[in-house]
Swiss-Prot record:
Homomultimerizes to form the nucleocapsid. Interacts with the phosphoprotein P. When in a monomeric RNA-free form, interacts with the phosphoprotein (via N-terminus). Interacts with protein M2-1; this interaction allows the association of nucleocapsid with the matrix protein. The keyword RNA-binding applies. One of its GO terms (molecular function) is protein serine/threonine kinase inhibitor activity. Changing residue 234 to K: In strain: Non-pathogenic 15. It holds the Pfam family Pneumo_ncap. The gene is N. It is found in: Virion; Host cytoplasm. It comes from Murine pneumonia virus (strain 15). The keyword Transit peptide does not apply. Its main location: virion. This is Nucleoprotein. Encapsidates the viral RNA genome by forming a left-handed helical nucleocapsid that protects the RNA from nucleases. RNA replication depends on the availability of soluble nucleoprotein. The encapsidated genomic RNA is termed the NC and serves as template for transcription and replication.
Amino acid sequence: MSLDRLKLNDVSNKDSLLSNCKYSVTRSTGDVTSVSGHAMQKALARTLGMFLLTAFNRCEEVAEIGLQYAMSLLGRDDSIKILREAGYNVKCVDTQLKDFTIKLQGKEYKIQVLDIVGIDAANLADLEIQARGVVAKELKTGARLPDNRRHDAPDCGVIVLCIAALVVSKLAAGDRGGLDAVERRALNVLKAEKARYPNMEVKQIAESFYDLFERKPYYIDVFITFGLAQSSVRGGSKVEGLFSGLFMNAYGAGQVMLRWGLLAKSVKNIMLGHASVQAEMEQVVEVYEYAQKQGGEAGFYHIRNNPKASLLSLTNCPNFTSVVLGNAAGLGIIGSYKGAPRNRELFDAAKDYAERLKDNNVINYSALNLTAEERELISQQLNIVDDTPDDDI
């Protein structure tokens, strides 16, 4: 049974207006930004490792380099495509390496530093000098830095992006009130990594990402797409696993979060239900694409500001519908929900949605992948007699 007839008129009208519009706007015309291809991965990760290794007092560049590292994992062409599809017309310049001369103990050395738009190569040269100084100091003591404490450890780039994932979860607030929370969370989750790199400036790195996302909002689209891609790939290192967990939590703490059928009042990310990261991916992508169809950022605000309408308009997303049913109808709102909802209006909207599903006999148990025990519990809570085949329920 189609759920289209459950849509509210205002949602249908908005959908029609948006889908029939023949025009678009172009943003950020004249902006110039670097984009990095796969070949730049090693150099970008190594530079990020230097920020972790040293107590470098200029961390404002670290976020830009971190996003370039994310682009290098996505690939140059895909990164440009993401920017274009998000409605940004920025001029993209390929990241390259440039020769630079530094002096160490009276001797000149030729090195290569990253050539990135908006970053002074001299700062990166100073960073290289400090990193070499840390390594030399260790060698003087007769010790050798373990491989996982060096600036060229393979997971340095992802460690920095873990902090970015925490920052994304706070962007919806519109201010930096969450900076201290980001720092505390990062020091807790990245405890082992902080032990490896005791000079890691977590707060400064977080501030760098706040600044970057404010100056270049198009990087948010790049980072979210990267996070989805990274989180959907099986395997990987321990830190990559940490990133996936942090990103998916951030993707739920920010924009449109459904937990027990309640839409949280925040903007930028989506996370649905209580399933694992892998199981959430289809639901996340589904609603993210819906919001993009509604007009990108405007789509997220539409979902946030119209909870009742949005719950109904999103019923054309099958994975979303099954999660709403599992959380709102099956596991809480109808039946034995305990506790006082923080927002009564949102609670009532979700409850009304769940009841409509029930009244119109559109509950599809097979879409929920329930155990026999869960199915029995939901049937009891919904007060439904299960006397029809699975696919027809």
